Amino acid sequence: MSAHLGVSRPTVRAGLRALATLGVVRSRRGSGTFITDGPPVLGSEPLSFLAALHGFTRGEMYEVRRILEVGAAGLAADRASPDHISTLADEVAGMFATLDDPNAFLSHDIRFHRTVGLSSGNPIVASLAEMVSGMYHEHRRATAVNASDRDLREAAEAHRRIYQAIRARDAQQARDAMNEHLRTAQAFQEAEPDPPIAVTRVTVPIPNPRT
């Protein structure tokens, strides 16, 4: 294929990886790559598409999470409904109840952050936070088993502090608690032997329209 298209093999692999993310093709080990029957899924996973094509570093992902989620936590302290606050409490309780099950813990973690985004009362913030957090957690599932009981307990405590600040309607404290949580989480991720986000950057040549 690379010879036929006149591009390098890494470029072909990057293109196929992007098409697989879109749902256009699927790969079978030992058999090859095939066109799928279903429709493309770019609309539902735009960040996954970009990651497959260009790659995101861990630092970039956490920068975006801080921009979105720290602000969302502050808005949530002002705007969260009683139902939102109740859901946050349930997810924190769920984290403490699943300290021995990293994958179940992660599910509560995902729902907690989703609820913070929804609690912001801004659908744009909620949607962007959902996309970024959702993509991050896709990778996080692969390394969740590396977390110890102590790691999970500290994470649960961090989420509880965020929840308590939102419940108290203290926007500054909510922002500070979320920022500290993300800072600590990033430091933990950087210490892991298998990073959750490790997509190699690939430059895809763009044809010159004049040629």
Protein language model regions, located:
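Short linear motifs at protein or domain termini
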Residues: 1-68, 74, 195-199, 203-211
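Conserved amphipathic alpha-helical segments that form helical-bundle/coiled-coil interaction surfaces
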Residues: 65-142, 155-164, 176-188
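Well-ordered alpha/beta subsegment
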Residues: 165-173
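C-terminal effector-binding regulatory domain of bacterial HTH transcription factors
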Residues: 172-211
